[in-house]
């Protein structure tokens, strides 16, 4: 356990503390968490992190999409039924920003030791307006556009609406993860 005194904050190298708490006008516990996360990210230790307070001050909006990590990237594993033909497509960008850039940017918010950790972090948060708005400051509140490379090698754009977290949870619970349907379930041993 380490304490961080005011003197400790002053002694942290500027490259590791881009915006000190002294310079920021922090008004909520959630904002403080984001600032501390930015401070911890350069440590590149995925086991050093801070969780949000139990009661969050803001409600979250999410896009109806879910991803899975595969071969150094992300593929779509859940989408609304009308876009089901795009399941298995590789994510190549969000709002025109290439995934490689997003991997680097998310590593400034969530500590990770390696490239796989960066990909996994984007996998977990690529549907979250709260996180994506930190990576894409121009992100709108009503919808988001994903750039995908389909299994038959076509690049397409798909625009999805954001929805309240409770509605997203309901949607997510009703969507079967069809990306696993091709995995054999009988006569299989590990």
Language-model regions, residue ranges each:
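Flexible, low-complexity junctional segments that flank or bridge functional domains
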Residues: 1-190
């Amino acid at each position: 356990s380490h304490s961080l005194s005011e003197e400790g904050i002053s002694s942290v190298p500027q490259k590791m503390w881009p915006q000190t708490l002294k310079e920021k006008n922090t008004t909520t516990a959630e904002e403080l968490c984001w600032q501390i996360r930015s401070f911890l990210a350069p440590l590149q230790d995925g086991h050093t992190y801070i969780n949000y307070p139990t009661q969050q001050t803001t409600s979250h909006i999410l896009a109806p999409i879910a991803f899975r990590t595969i071969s150094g990237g992300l593929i779509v594993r859940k989408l609304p039924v009308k876009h089901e033909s795009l399941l298995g497509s590789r994510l190549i960008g969000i709002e025109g920003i290439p995934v490689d850039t997003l991997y680097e940017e998310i590593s400034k918010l969530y500590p990770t030791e390696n490239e796989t950790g960066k990909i996994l972090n984007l996998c977990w948060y690529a549907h979250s307006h709260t996180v994506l708005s930190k990576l894409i400051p121009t992100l709108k509140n009503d919808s988001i556009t994903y750039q995908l490379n389909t299994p038959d090698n076509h690049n397409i754009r798909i625009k999805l609406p954001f929805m309240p977290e409770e509605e997203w949870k309901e949607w997510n619970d009703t969507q079967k993860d069809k990306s696993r349907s091709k995995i054999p379930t009988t006569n299989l041993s590990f």
